[in-house]
Protein backbone atom coordinates (compact mmCIF):
# COMPACT_ATOMS: atom_id res chain seq x y z
CA UNK A 1 0.00 0.00 0.00
CA UNK A 2 1.51 3.34 -1.03
CA UNK A 3 2.11 5.98 1.61
CA UNK A 4 0.63 9.47 1.56
CA UNK A 5 4.12 10.80 0.94
CA UNK A 6 4.46 8.73 -2.26
CA UNK A 7 1.07 9.97 -3.44
CA UNK A 8 2.06 13.56 -2.68
CA UNK A 9 5.36 13.12 -4.53
CA UNK A 10 3.63 11.89 -7.68
CA UNK A 11 1.01 14.63 -7.56
CA UNK A 12 3.60 17.33 -6.91
CA UNK A 13 5.59 16.21 -9.97
CA UNK A 14 2.42 16.30 -12.07
CA UNK A 15 1.35 19.69 -10.73
CA UNK A 16 4.65 21.49 -10.40
CA UNK A 17 7.13 20.48 -13.04
CA UNK A 18 4.77 19.14 -15.67
CA UNK A 19 1.63 21.24 -15.13
CA UNK A 20 -0.63 18.26 -15.77
CA UNK A 21 -4.08 19.52 -14.79
CA UNK A 22 -7.26 18.51 -16.62
CA UNK A 23 -6.73 17.79 -20.31
CA UNK A 24 -2.93 17.97 -20.12
CA UNK A 25 -1.64 14.51 -19.26
CA UNK A 26 1.66 12.66 -19.11
CA UNK A 27 2.57 9.06 -19.89
CA UNK A 28 3.00 6.71 -16.94
CA UNK A 29 6.32 5.51 -18.35
CA UNK A 30 7.82 8.86 -17.26
CA UNK A 31 7.22 7.92 -13.62
CA UNK A 32 9.23 4.69 -13.39
CA UNK A 33 10.96 5.80 -10.19
CA UNK A 34 7.74 5.24 -8.23
CA UNK A 35 7.77 1.61 -7.12
CA UNK A 36 4.06 1.52 -6.28
CA UNK A 37 2.91 3.49 -9.32
CA UNK A 38 -0.02 1.22 -10.22
CA UNK A 39 -1.34 1.24 -6.66
CA UNK A 40 -0.91 5.01 -6.35
CA UNK A 41 -2.78 5.57 -9.61
CA UNK A 42 -5.54 3.17 -8.55
CA UNK A 43 -6.07 4.87 -5.16
CA UNK A 44 -5.90 8.44 -6.45
CA UNK A 45 -8.23 7.74 -9.38
CA UNK A 46 -10.70 6.07 -7.01
CA UNK A 47 -10.69 9.32 -4.97
CA UNK A 48 -11.26 11.27 -8.17
CA UNK A 49 -8.03 13.24 -7.80
CA UNK A 50 -6.32 11.59 -10.76
CA UNK A 51 -7.70 11.25 -14.29
CA UNK A 52 -6.49 8.20 -16.20
CA UNK A 53 -6.43 8.36 -20.01
CA UNK A 54 -6.24 4.88 -21.54
CA UNK A 55 -4.79 5.21 -25.01
CA UNK A 56 -3.98 2.34 -27.40
CA UNK A 57 -0.21 2.61 -26.94
CA UNK A 58 0.11 4.14 -23.47
CA UNK A 59 -1.65 5.26 -20.30
CA UNK A 60 -1.69 8.96 -19.49
CA UNK A 61 -2.43 10.58 -16.13
CA UNK A 62 -3.37 14.09 -15.05
CA UNK A 63 -4.72 15.82 -11.96
CA UNK A 64 -8.43 16.57 -11.72
CA UNK A 65 -9.07 20.34 -11.64
CA UNK A 66 -12.33 19.77 -9.72
CA UNK A 67 -10.24 18.84 -6.68
CA UNK A 68 -7.41 21.34 -7.20
CA UNK A 69 -7.76 22.94 -3.75
CA UNK A 70 -7.82 19.58 -1.95
CA UNK A 71 -4.88 18.24 -3.98
CA UNK A 72 -2.73 21.29 -3.25
CA UNK A 73 -3.60 21.13 0.48
CA UNK A 74 -2.70 17.42 0.56
CA UNK A 75 0.64 18.01 -1.17
CA UNK A 76 1.50 20.91 1.15
CA UNK A 77 0.57 18.82 4.21
CA UNK A 78 2.85 15.94 3.18
CA UNK A 79 5.61 18.13 1.70
CA UNK A 80 5.54 21.40 3.71
CA UNK A 81 8.52 22.93 1.89
CA UNK A 82 6.30 23.22 -1.22
CA UNK A 83 3.80 25.46 0.56
CA UNK A 84 2.83 28.36 -1.68
CA UNK A 85 4.77 27.05 -4.69
CA UNK A 86 2.05 24.96 -6.36
CA UNK A 87 -0.74 26.99 -7.91
Indicate residue ranges for each PLM-predicted region.
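Short amphipathic alpha-helical interface segments
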Residues: 2-32
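Surface-exposed polar/charged interaction patches
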Residues: 17, 47, 78-81
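Short amphipathic alpha-helical interaction segments
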Residues: 31-47
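A short, conserved structural fragment
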Residues: 45-55
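Minor-groove-contacting beta-hairpin "wing" of winged helix-turn-helix DNA-binding domains
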Residues: 57-64
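Short, amphipathic alpha-helical interaction segments positioned at domain boundaries
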Residues: 66-87
Amino acid sequence: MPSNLEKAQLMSVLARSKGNWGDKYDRTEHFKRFQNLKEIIKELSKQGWLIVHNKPKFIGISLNTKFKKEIIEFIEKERPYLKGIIK
